[in-house]
Amino acid sequence: MKVLMINGSPHVKGNTRIALDEMVKIFEKEGIDTEIIHVGHQDIRGCIACMTCKKGKNQCVFDDLVNQVAPKFEQCDGFVVGTPVYYGSANSTLISFLTRLFYSTSFDKTMKVGASVVVARRGGISSTYDEINKFFAISGMPIASTQYWGRTQRRSSMALSIGTV
């Protein structure tokens, strides 16, 4: 069994990665393979509705990380998306990535489990959780539920001030 995890934060070792790493520990205890792909710092364009992906190629016209991740997405059994909250929604780079990834891949996703991890300092947790879960729901994927919208608390102010976490 394999779980593909997407880090939508622009910070490679930020709060979102810390939350995903906690999940990796649990998956490893259960003998589940994981891979984390960091997309939040990438230059990823949004979908331009050119329909190239629907004209037989099953890949996006922009040859970037989306096309590299698509085969891994097809092969995984679980798909976890982690994101920080910016202005009440997910990181826009992540949304561009997910929109193109889900739209350009035509394989059946109905038995692939999706899960969201949302990290915020203030508000926007529930709307961001809903925003990510819509990708799963629209694709007919079972959604791994959690308590209190899959959110995490930000790092403590002490940890932020010394930069050790």
Give, region by region, the residue ranges found by the protein language model:
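Glycine-rich phosphate/pyrophosphate-binding loop and the adjoining helix
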Residues: 1, 24, 28-29, 142-165
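A short beta-strand-loop structural module common to alpha/beta enzyme folds
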Residues: 32-42
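Short, glycine/serine-rich, charged loops/turns that create anion-binding
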Residues: 10-11, 41, 121
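Helix-loop-strand module that forms the ligand-binding subsite of alpha/beta enzymes
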Residues: 61-145
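N-terminal beta1-alpha1 ligand-phosphate binding loop
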Residues: 2-32
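Short, hinge-like loop/turn segments at secondary-structure boundaries
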Residues: 51-55, 99, 133, 162-163
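Cysteine-cluster motifs in flexible loop/terminal segments that predominantly coordinate metals
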Residues: 42-73
